[in-house]
């Protein structure tokens, strides 16, 4: 049995669920045709990365039903069966909200060109959002693809068309069904999250134990309301894209070199404040000072904030950069130096 560092684990918020402080993001694994060109399709390579992460102690995997039209979830399930991973030793986070379609990118583009929001689209009726019907259908399908239960089911976004009572009752019921152990949320306004939590509290239903929000050195708007609220109420923070879609891993001049930086639709839509270049320069400077990669430095900042960041690993060799972040202890002076150039930016990540 391998020796795993206690430093790599912690409870998710006030819950008793222990997760690895680094969470393996599985959006990168699936099919290019169903998602984007930077997705890793080779199953054996995907399993090699997952096994290396698992052996190193990263035993919490984050996926979603919509990633590559469900292929990402299928790969997580196949990995568990291929290596006969004890189910009790791994934590699976998945999500529901978006449609699960092989033509998802195309249909979103078509609807956008017609000025129709996907939640209002007749073609996607009951295939997205947070209605009781869709939540139940999504959980049934995810459990089939995974071949097992979901440890934390996260609502991918807030649905303004469905009442808080309907959403939280449905989530409570899927937990009571045994197909889901806990519930979490992702990317919404703080007042929306509070409304949902208060509704669950009022009725004695299961509440969210985690918030998966967009938070990194280039985007810190969540520090105004959402993060303080979560910290105050014991909700665990598991930020997605702690490396800002890879932008925090390379110097400014190198940021147009990867397939992802050239083709990722979300990356191209990002907006950065006036301090963007200064922040990247300081990340690069401190990375050299500590003799680590920029990815390690940026991930260490996230860990310092008390977050359990979701890390995307596209090659086994990159795993060491993520693990090194757990060992790297930044000083308060380092943190201040990294954060100082930040300037406010528009709210991002919402639908």
From Swiss-Prot:
Q: What is its EC number?
A: 1.1.1.-
Q: Which residues carry this modification: Phosphoserine?
A: 113
The answer to whether the entry has keyword Oxidoreductase is yes
Which GO molecular function annotation, any one, does this entry have? oxidoreductase activity
- Transmembrane stretches in the record are none
UniProt keywords (A-Z) are: Cytoplasm, Nucleus, Oxidoreductase, Phosphoprotein
InterPro entries from the xrefs? AKR_Detox_Biosynth (IPR050523), NADP_OxRdtase_dom (IPR023210), NADP_OxRdtase_dom_sf (IPR036812)
Instruction: Enumerate the subcellular locations listed in this protein's record, separating them with semicolons.
Output: Cytoplasm; Nucleus
The terms describing its cellular component in GO are: cytosol; nucleus
Pfam families assigned to the protein according to its UniProt record, in alphabetical order: Aldo_ket_red
- What does the record list as GO biological process? potassium ion transmembrane transport
Instruction: Tell me the PANTHER family matching this sequence.
Output: ARYL-ALCOHOL DEHYDROGENASE AAD16-RELATED (PTHR43364:SF15), NADH-SPECIFIC METHYLGLYOXAL REDUCTASE-RELATED (PTHR43364)
Q: Which family is this sequence assigned to?
A: Belongs to the aldo/keto reductase family. Aldo/keto reductase 2 subfamily.
Indicate what this protein is called per its UniProt record.
Answer: Putative aryl-alcohol dehydrogenase C977.14c
